[in-house]
């Protein structure tokens, strides 16, 4: 279904508008894993990013290159010769672009949907905040966190910490 949504989007660039409910649902589930069933019907965005990065023909190449037992991530990493670290960096870049929809093919149509991500943070003391457990990012999922931009010249310090092994940290296949 992600493939079908991606192909529909190629034919109808205004897909984000006329089937806006898919974008609304995607925004509710950006924390889910890239291939999670929740995003099946409304997340062609990674395919768009890959095609933007590697050319319009890339999606077809990806589909034709898939081997038995591979998912799109496995195929992508294999045909682009990426390490896991390189893939993680690329998925981070993709997620950043999804905040503003900063991709040439869609930016004119999608700009009105920029900066609409929301994430609830709970104060946990000592100026630390935690994403709610139900919105903790899964593999290649992300949270868009709005920041209040301080005055120019203001020094800010941020510390990010994933606390593996605690009750609030979910692990799979470790």
Question: Where on the chain are the PLM-derived regions?
Answer:
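Acidic/His/Gly-enriched intrinsically disordered linker/tail segments
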Residues: 1-53, 57, 63-98
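Beta/coil-rich, acidic/histidine-enriched accessory regions frequently appended to metallopeptidases
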Residues: 68-174
């Amino acid at each position: 279904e992600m493939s079908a949504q991606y192909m529909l989007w190629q034919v109808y660039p205004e897909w984000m508008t006329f089937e806006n409910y898919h974008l609304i649902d995607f925004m509710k589930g950006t924390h889910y894993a890239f291939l999670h069933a929740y995003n099946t019907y409304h997340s062609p965005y990674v395919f768009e990013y890959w095609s933007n990065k590697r050319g319009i023909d890339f999606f077809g190449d990806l589909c034709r290159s898939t081997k038995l037992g591979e998912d799109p991530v496995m195929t992508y990493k294999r045909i682009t010769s990426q390490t896991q670290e390189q893939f993680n960096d690329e998925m981070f870049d993709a997620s950043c672009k999804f905040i503003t929809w900063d991709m040439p093919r869609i930016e004119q149509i999608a700009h009105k949907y920029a900066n609409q991500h929301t994430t609830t943070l709970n104060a946990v003391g000592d100026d630390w905040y935690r994403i709610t457990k139900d919105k903790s990012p899964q593999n290649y999922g992300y949270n868009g966190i709005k920041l209040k931009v301080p005055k120019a010249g203001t020094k800010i310090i941020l510390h990010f910490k994933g606390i593996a092994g605690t009750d609030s940290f979910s692990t799979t296949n470790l």
